[in-house]
Amino acid sequence: LLQASIIGKPLWNYISDETTRSLYQQMVARVREGRSAQFSLRCDGPDCRRLLEMTIRAGANGTVEFATRTLRLDHRAPVAMLSRQVPRSTDLLRVCAWCNRVDAGSGTGQWVEVEDAIESLRLFELPLPPQLTHGICETCFAAMSKTIQNLNT
């Protein structure tokens, strides 16, 4: 995404998963009431694992500011599955938007690191890897729900 194409557009245009969008909308609503939210999330690249801390706070004139800082950066051998340059099939593989683990169980609640998902789902045996889409695992949903609940007190 290019900066010029997203500035001034609603954030919600870029969050496709309904549950994830709802959690962020709830946090933004609390921030607009004068609270601030802070939580950790993963934002991995093909050659690294990044643990970030996000702070959401009220800005000037009714705006909301999102700030992140890197808590930890671990380099690893590149994982092609995470590269935007790799051609993809039309199939979807769900990745948690907070912990970056992969849904490896078709609704069984089994979420694993990408390297483990590649092996257990035999992704390298596919003609083309699936597209990645974001959702939220049960563990992160519970943690984020608690974060939002704490904003209400």
Task: Annotate the PLM regions.
Residues 1-83:
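Sensory/regulatory domains in signal-transduction proteins
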Residues 26-32, 58-153:
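PAS-family sensory modules
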